[in-house]
């Protein structure tokens, strides 16, 4: 069972780097970014309130293989506290996330998926580096613009 995943250099020091879009995490694991304070062995389940839209109950749990997408999830999630990135294992089948698949780019370059089944937390990445303040503000501004234009649709 994985608990904490750290990448170390030849001197044994933990290596951190800014997440890069479309780059699969070196572990190959599925990841989930959130602000929820959970423990190894807990399950993420459908039927909970959205991290991004107050009052909306989600039919799916969303996961990714890229650290960048998981970091965005952790940073943009509603709630107090620090963002967290969990290493997860789905109980059931995954499907491509239709919110990003074949949208701005063909295919599923963010390696983003969803499931209607529970997802078990098997570890946590604790040494990740977030996006710059400028990137965060750019994302917030872009989402606010979509909201103003009525285009902030989540296909769930």
Where do the language-model regions lie?
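Active-site and NAD+-binding cores of ADP-ribose-processing enzymes
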Residues: 2-5, 12, 17, 24-28, ...
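A short linear-motif detector with a strong N-terminal bias
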Residues: 8-12, 41, 62-68
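Short secondary-structure boundary/capping segments within folded domains
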Residues: 20-23, 52-53
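Extended catalytic/binding region for NAD+/ADP-ribose chemistry, centered on the ART fold
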Residues: 49-79
């Amino acid at each position: 069972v994985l608990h904490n995943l750290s990448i170390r250099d030849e001197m044994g020091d933990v290596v951190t780097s800014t997440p890069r879009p479309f780059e699969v995490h070196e572990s190959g694991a599925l990841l989930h970014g959130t602000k929820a304070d959970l423990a190894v062995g807990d399950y993420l389940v459908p039927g909970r309130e959205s991290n991004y839209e107050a009052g909306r109950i989600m039919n799916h749990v969303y996961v990714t293989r890229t650290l960048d997408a998981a970091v965005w999830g952790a940073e943009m999630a509603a709630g107090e506290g620090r963002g967290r990135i969990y290493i997860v294992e789905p109980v059931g089948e995954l499907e491509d996330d239709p919110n990003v698949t074949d949208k701005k780019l063909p295919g599923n370059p963010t390696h983003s998926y969803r499931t209607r089944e529970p997802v078990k937390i098997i570890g946590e990445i604790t040494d990740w580096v977030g996006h710059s303040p400028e990137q965060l503000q750019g994302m917030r501004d872009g989402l606010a613009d979509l909201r103003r234009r009525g285009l902030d649709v989540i296909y769930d």
